[in-house]
Amino acid sequence: MATKRILVVSDLHGSRMAYGKLSNAPKIYDCDMVILAGDLTGKAVVPIVNRGNTTYDVVIFGDHKIIKENELEGTIKTIEMSGYYTAVMSREEHEEISSNDNRINELFLKVEREKLGGALAQIDAKYSKDDVKLFIMPGNDDSESISRFVKQYTDGSKTFIDIDEGIANFEDLQLLGFGYSNKTPWNSPRELTEEEIDRRLNELFDRSEQKRMNKTIAVIHVPPYDTMIDKAPELTADLRPVIKGGDAVMKSVGSRSVRSLIEKYSPMLGVHGHIHESAGVDYIRDRSTKKVPVLNAGSEYQDGVLRGALLTLSDSGIENIMLTRG
């Protein structure tokens, strides 16, 4: 193949600004293929309550504010830039929803589908002009409802390819996708035991063309255990960071099964995310002692920053991996 440039991003968590930057990224980085490696949606919906007199009540990052009509659009943009969603509603609607857990969940599912659909439509409008492909999958923080939405949205698309627990091809490359994670303290929607990860990933690799592992990118949301890209703060029983000498104590939180399977199958590259603060590139030795590169682009979605990893590939393999931030 001719020299190819691929942009890898992950963990955008619904950030309106990060998605906007992603829509422009292929022109900036001169690439015709993008991988979005999971955690697509936001964390919560922030209600903006109409007081009935052209003012609104809203709690922004813990601070209650009363805003005017002419401040509404800017407030929505500020909130959604950092990965939260917004919903403007009347006092009556807010009272009804806030006292009913089912209605809260229904609202969140409705809003996250609408917002993700809007972000993907913005991307499609730009990528389709230059025939750029985006390989996408949900992560552990995305609901199974979003997993189904992504499958439906991408079905028949010329721009998007859903790779969650699937195999796709791009020219001579083979991509495997797996968006679940191991168990976390946060009890997120798509977590599995190590045994289940091992079983399902083995099944996925077994379905692939194993003679093409030297041209295979394994897109696995959770990083492999005991690497430079799986370090997160150690937490106490009440989920507070452990501090020693004024610094947070870091520990490996990646998947042992993912590491074992990379050692076993030896793909060309492992692409990961999940641990926002562990951007970087590391190497795992397979069973023949060959080094397999694994990367995590990291995430600063809450600041509207798009972090990435720009890959340069040629017939001989990976020429360069450059971490990006913009």
Regions inferred by a protein language model and the residue ranges of each:
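Active-site-proximal beta-strand elements of phosphoester/diester hydrolases
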Residues: T3-H13, D172-T184, I217-H221, V292-S299, ...
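Divalent metal-coordination and catalytic microenvironments
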Residues: D11, Y19, V34, D39, ...
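Active-site environment of divalent metal-dependent phosphoester hydrolases
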Residues: H13-M17, T41-V45, M137-R148, A168, ...
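Binuclear metal-dependent phosphoesterase catalytic core
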Residues: G14, G166-E171, L192, K264, ...
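Catalytic phosphate/metal-binding cores of nucleic-acid and nucleotide-processing enzymes, i.e., regions
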Residues: R16, G20, Y29, V242, ...
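Core catalytic region of metal-dependent phosphoesterases/phosphodiesterases
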Residues: A18-F170
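Active-site-proximal segments of metal-dependent phosphoesterases and phosphodiesterases across multiple
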Residues: N102-R113, I217-S266
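Binuclear metal-dependent hydrolase catalytic cores centered on His/Asp/Glu-rich metal-binding motifs
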Residues: E171-T216, A237, K244-R256
